[in-house]
C-alpha cells in the first residue's frame, strides 16, 4: 500500500514550480567509493546540496509533502504520506524510488537527476541500516 501514498505525494510535489531553486556543485570527492557510507560525511552533504532548498520548513517540497531533510531526525520522520526510508531496504524506500525516477516524478523535481554515484551512496547508506553516523 506504499505506492498509492507515494503517488499522492508525487502528485502533490509535482504540482510545484521549483524554477527558483539552486543546486550546489558536487563536492570534489563526492563519488569516491566508500567502504562504509556515513550520514554526516556522505549523505548530509548530498541532501544539503541537492534537496534542502525545497525540503526544509517553509520550502515548497516541505509544504507539499511534509518532508524535512535538514537533519537526520527530521528525515527519518518521513512525510505526511508515510516513511521515506526503510533501514536495510533501499529498494523499498520511497527516497530511492523518487531519486531513481521510479515514481511518476523524479527528485530533485525540475532539475537534473542526481549523479549515479550519489544515488549509489544513498542506496548503500540505506542498505547499511541508514544509521545516524
Where are these regions (language model features)?
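Aromatic- and Gly/Pro-enriched helix-to-coil junctions and flexible linker segments
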Residues: 23-133
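Positively charged n-region of N-terminal signal peptides that target proteins for export
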Residues: 1-5
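Bacterial N-terminal signal peptides
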Residues: 9-21
Amino acid at each position: 500500500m506504499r505506492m498509492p501514498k507515494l503517488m499522492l505525494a508525487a502528485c502533490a510535489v509535482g504540482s510545484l514550480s521549483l524554477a527558483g531553486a539552486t543546486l550546489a556543485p558536487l563536492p570534489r570527492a563526492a563519488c569516491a567509493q566508500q567502504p562504509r557510507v556515513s550520514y554526516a560525511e556522505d549523505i548530509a552533504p548530498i541532501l544539503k546540496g541537492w534537496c534542502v532548498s525545497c525540503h526544509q520548513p517553509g520550502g515548497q517540497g516541505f509544504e507539499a509533502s511534509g518532508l524535512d531533510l535538514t537533519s537526520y531526525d527530521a528525515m527519518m520522520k518521513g512525510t505526511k504520506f508515510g516513511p521515506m526510508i526503510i533501514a536495510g531496504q533501499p529498494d523499498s524506500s520511497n527516497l530511492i524510488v523518487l531519486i531513481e525516477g521510479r515514481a511518476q516524478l523524479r527528485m530533485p523535481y525540475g532539475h537534473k537527476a542526481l549523479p549515479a554515484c550519489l544515488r549509489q551512496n544513498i542506496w548503500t547508506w540505506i542498505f547499511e541500516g541508514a544509521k545516524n553516523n
